[in-house]
């Protein structure tokens, strides 16, 4: 999960890419005590994905509304696996 990019589309149509860093993952774990990120991937809960996007955008320097108002501005979240990122890099 660390190093995975998120493509986050907000309801205003703006699109941002932010990386799941250790800082983002730790913030997510603090907000979801007792839960593992791997379990989130297997048993998808929309609020957890929204919070991951929220933290990733904040850590990337994107100005977002405070949680939970951020949820109302969220349009879509796409996970970009590490392997696909490597494929898109020039030789």
What residue spans do the PLM features occupy?
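Charged interaction scaffolds used for protein-protein
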Residues: 1-16, 23-91
